[in-house]
């Protein structure tokens, strides 16, 4: 008798009782990704485990059932009285934004109503990709005539869940997208067209801002700036979610990449012997015409730092008493790969 409702009416002649069969229908839900290009084939996202409450009113106070999705985004089917219901997500699935919209749906007797919904994937709106610093000073200011501008980095994005700080390429995985970026005068690269040299299309938020999906990003320097040696280290940055359903996550940790100065050591010794001579002053003229004076230490050594690309000269300016100045000029060059040739 649970499928029937009894009604009682009264008049002057008699009491009237009748029974009507309740009108039932069914309801289920189909969940899809609002951005399948980002989520399909990416184990950081799953449509399984989303929970939607089914309510009698738009205020969503009287719940009559729950709908829970499987890995294909299909929910269980519930039987309810015919009428209008309001469906709202109470738990977002892995990697997706909680859908706060209230969805009205009408259930017709004897039929199954299917509500189709879409969830946005969580994204990380990265601003600064990386920053370069001088290894000696730990600052984003170059030494001498060196520059932090013009370094190039290859950035790769992998559709995969992080495994600690392991490079996905070591696991045989292929990057989904990759780009080459160039640093500005502050040694920074930003995820935008101004710093892009070449590469694939950017991932974008619904408002058009550049972003990364959940997964793994690797950063590697592929061209050093003037005056520095290339840093071969591959920096692995996991982009993860705590699955709280928030629209954006901020787990991209901008790497600070240290740069080692390109240097040339010069040692002044007594002719025919290995005796070092201290106090010898040299004039170094770099490829841009800038000059500096450097003096040998007690080991007869002087170090030229931050060598720019092009031709350089070294010439003795003065020597200690008892020594004769060498009139010769030493020339050396630095090529585009920061290789020194004497």
What is the meaning of each model-derived region?
Residues 1-342:
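Solvent-exposed loop/turn and edge beta-strand elements of beta-rich ligand-binding domains
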């Amino acid at each position: 008798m649970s499928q029937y409702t009894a009604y009682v009416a009264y008049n002057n002649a008699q009491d009237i009782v009748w029974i009507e069969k309740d009108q039932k229908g069914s309801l289920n839900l189909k969940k899809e990704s609002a951005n399948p290009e980002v989520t399909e084939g990416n184990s950081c996202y799953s449509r399984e485990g989303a929970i939607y409450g089914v309510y009698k009113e738009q205020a969503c106070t009287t719940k009559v059932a729950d709908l829970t999705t499987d890995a294909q985004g299909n929910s269980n089917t519930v039987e309810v009285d015919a009428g209008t219901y309001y469906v709202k997500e109470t738990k977002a699935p892995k990697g997706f934004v909680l859908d706060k919209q209230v969805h009205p749906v009408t259930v017709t007797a004897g039929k199954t109503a299917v509500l189709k919904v879409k969830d946005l994937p969580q994204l990380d709106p990265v601003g600064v990709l990386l920053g370069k610093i001088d290894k000696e000073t730990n600052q984003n200011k170059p030494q001498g005539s060196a520059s932090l501008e013009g370094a190039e980095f290859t950035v790769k994005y992998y559709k995969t869940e992080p495994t600690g700080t392991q490079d996905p390429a070591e696991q045989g995985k292929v990057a989904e997208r990759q780009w080459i970026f160039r640093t500005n005068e502050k040694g920074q690269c930003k995820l935008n067209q101004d710093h892009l040299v070449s590469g694939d299309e950017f991932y974008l938020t619904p408002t058009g801002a550049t972003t990364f999906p959940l997964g793994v990003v690797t950063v590697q320097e592929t061209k050093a700036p003037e005056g520095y040696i290339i840093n071969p280290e591959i920096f692995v940055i996991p982009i993860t979610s705590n699955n709280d359903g928030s629209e954006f996550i901020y787990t991209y940790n901008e790497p600070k990449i240290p740069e080692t100065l390109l240097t040339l050591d010069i040692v002044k010794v007594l002719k025919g012997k290995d005796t070092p001579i201290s106090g010898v002053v040299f004039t170094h003229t770099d490829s841009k015409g800038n000059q500096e004076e450097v003096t040998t230490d007690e080991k007869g050594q002087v170090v030229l730092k931050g060598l720019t690309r092009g031709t350089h000269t070294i010439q003795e300016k003065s020597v200690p008493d008892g020594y004769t100045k060498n009139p010769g000029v030493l020339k050396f060059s630095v090529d585009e790969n920061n290789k020194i040739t004497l």
